[in-house]
Curated annotation (Swiss-Prot):
Function: Catalytic component of the COMPASS (Set1C) complex that specifically mono-, di- and trimethylates histone H3 to form H3K4me1/2/3. Binds RNAs which might negatively affect its histone methyltransferase activity. COMPASS recognizes ubiquitinated H2B on one face of the nucleosome which stimulates the methylation of H3 on the opposing face.
Keywords for this protein: Chromatin regulator, Chromosome, Methyltransferase, Nucleus, S-adenosyl-L-methionine, Transferase
Free-text comment on this protein's domains from its UniProt entry: The RxxxRR motif forms an adapter helix that bridges the nucleosome and ubiquitin.
Subcellular location: Nucleus; Chromosome
Motif, RxxxRR motif: chain positions: 799-804
Biased composition (Acidic residues): 574-587
Stated name of the protein: Histone-lysine N-methyltransferase, H3 lysine-4 specific
Source taxon at top rank: Eukaryota
Oligomer status and interactors: Component of the Set1C/COMPASS complex.
One cellular component (GO) term of this entry: Set1C/COMPASS complex
Amino acid sequence: MSGYYNHVKHQGYSRYGQNSTVRNGQHDGLRYRNPSPAHNGTNEGEGLQGSRYENAGGVTHARRPPPVVKWGEAAFRAKYHYFDVEERKLLHLDEMKHWQNGRLPANGYVLVADAGSKGRPVMRERNPEEQAVDPRGARAAHTVRRVRSLLTALPRIPYDAHWVGPEPPKEVVVFPKQREQALSVQDPIIKNFFGTFGEVAHFESFNDPNNALPLNIYLVRYINVEGNPDSPYKAAYKAVKQFAKQDYLVSGARFAVRLNMNGFLQKTIDKFVTENLQRAAKLRHEQAKQQSTVQKVTNVSAVPSGVPPPKIPLGLERIVNNKPILRVSARFCALHGITSEDFKYGLKNYHWTRVINHYSGIYIIFDDIAEAEKCLQMESLRLTFFSRRRKIPVKIKFMLIEPSHQPPASQPLTDQDEVPKVYETEAELIEETLKHIINELKTTLYKDIRRRLLGPTIFDALNPGNYPDIVARRQKEEEAKKEKEKAMVEKTKKEAPSAAAFDIFNLYGTAYKKRDGTKGKKRHVAEGRPEESSGRRRIQSKGTAPMAHMLNYESLKVNGTASPIKEAESETCSSDEEDDDNFDVEMTDQSSIKKLKRESTATTPEQEPLQERVAGLSAERTKELLSYPEKYRPLAGDQPEPIYPEFLIEKYDDPLLSIVDLQRSVKDKEDMELLKKVIAYDREEVKDVINDIEFFAWRLHRDYKEHKENMQHQSKLSESTYKNLLNAHGGCFKQQGFRKMPDKLKSIYLPHRRKLNQPLNTVYHHGIEDFANTDNNKMDTDPPEDTFTPEQTSSRVNRALQRRFQQDIEAQKAAIGTESELLSLNQLTKRKKPVTFARSAIHNWGLYALEPISAKEMIIEYVGERIRQPVAEMREKRYLKSGIGSSYLFRVDESTVIDATKKGGIARFINHCCDPSCTAKIIKVGGMKRIVIYALRDIAANEELTYDYKFERETDDEERLPCLCGAPNCKGFLN
């Protein structure tokens, strides 16, 4: 074995030694040796002496494969730092230079802190003998930068085709940070907000799988825009980065925004579902515990304790009605100025029934004890209100007053109390059931007999045709009664006072006569006929009343105060007409009564006496004339006079005709017969008969009066007529959902649509007095206060000032000697009038004048982005697709259009009107065409500026746009 090691250590036996020879490109010393003993019995050392490559037996072994150098080509060997693995040296060592050329220190450099330069690092020569010092033990230098709370964020690498690694997240998870209270957040609000970061491809909200309640967890996934693959990832990154240090606040709730990485969405959902299960289990446990407590209280008599439970005040026991309530101390509420309205808004997420503001405190009443305990647990010492006294937020502490579980005191049973009967056997139950059924059958049979047998028999027996003698006698009595009435009427008319008896002083009653009696005596004496006047006064005192009261006697029935004239006239009318008149006058409003009084003051020509009208007529014609009531008798005249004022149902706005309008339209029996024919009335076919017709008619009159008063109040508030199209056809408006309202109806209920010619003053001017709110107690003789009114400069003065300003600018340009954009002046900006925009009565927004503008004066320039005609057509289509319905494109000439949709001034808000107050002119300023708005007429302050759009006529009627300008000469359409 010693010989083997000697051979191995010898230099000539090295794999790449100097003694190894190369044969055919391969080394000769690469053959493995066989260390096994020789076959001829000699030892290993002797076997190796014969040959280095052959063993004693003469057996030849395979050669070891030569090494193959991978980078042995000429291109690699020409490199400057190439190392030859076969020769074990650098091939270009001779060309290299040593770094120790005397200019650099042999031991290198070290960095040390320079004490004279505030710790700045300095490089100096390294000394190996110098002992090293640990810099951590030294005192750190003072720095002024802020302490880092987070590590420096790496820059975001945009996603492209050369991206290496997993795809970055493009989904955002939005979840609430507070789970104590129920959230009422609508999904479109979340979706629309996060849609501002990028185009949303998918939006989803998640619910609890156990109870289907919303978890308020939302997933927003973005989609890439064409040509930009990094857009969805960048949008998600921007959304998360914006809310990294602050929460997303919406509808009073705070949300966190995170990227959906490593299954974050599923983890969040599982966490929320688990919390809901735990909360539900806790509530069930508390409910079971409460039920057990209630059962113990009901079974065991109450034992008085040291501290009495809180009680409800005596005045609230009936209102509370043994329900759970939460109480807040009155002293606390008075100290901080908290009212019941604050609790209604603060506890809007809970199902309370009533909030009572009592002198002892504020009481919140609940129907369910569980809801009251939930509110107590979630809001006590958590609900915060702002103190109106101390100007600080304060927390509210609630006190729960549970309902008493004591059973009500037993009361003796009365005859009205129903005691359930208990049957011992089944036979008794069957017998009692049969009795009940037989009693019901008896009752039904009695009703059927009365309705089918007794009723028709009695009506047939009472038929007037069966008693001709009684009918004839009754007719004779009626004729005698009519003759008596006619005689009474003639007698009364003969004794009736003339129009001269109604003195103007009689309108004021007896009090005025006593006070001014001397004047009346003098007047009668002057006339020279005291006897006649006294007689007339005596007749008036007996049978007449003042004229102001007699105006009402024509329609109103006053028992015991009507004059004989009214009684005689009323007897000639039918009872049906009297009832109609009564109901008609009862519902007459005060305005109609005042109108009637005003009309009564006018003098009317005195009618001819009855004898003169009857004179010259035959007996038959006289009888026929007297058979008609007084108001229906014909009168001689040039033109026929109507008896009743004309009432056209066609002009009635309401589709449902009220009972008052029906009575106004039906005046006599002829109208009643026509009405029966129109509605195909048949007495025998009437099914639903109203028993108390007077009460039903009174209720209809009451409803009509209330409806009319409501309409008057609405017209006073809205300053416009109310349309029935605004009424909800299915109950309330919430039941109908969202619907598009025509622009014509918006002028009824929108404040800015009510006044077309007098728009609302939407701009507040400092220094202008509000004359409506001035002190009314000031006398007219008070000297006027000194007020400053700004002087109104004319357009001519403005142009002169502008020219002077332009000359100053030209002088500055000449002094500088160079053209500059800073010294360019748009003259139109100096000449424009003070205008503003506000809600318009015509359409959306409008342009208003802040001061009076004279005719032919310039108002404002229509500015915007100058584009070509093809670009304008393309933008118009794009605006329509994006939902921008209003067009702000103004044509200058055939090839140029001004687009003020996104870049422009307030002149774009000018609306169309068929009777415009302004016109547009194209002028040149500095060699460039500009659009300028001029006044066609004098315009008042706060008046809306309008302009005729001059659209071309559309051939398709569906494409025409309705015009809402409200001008007298309105064409109806814009195009």
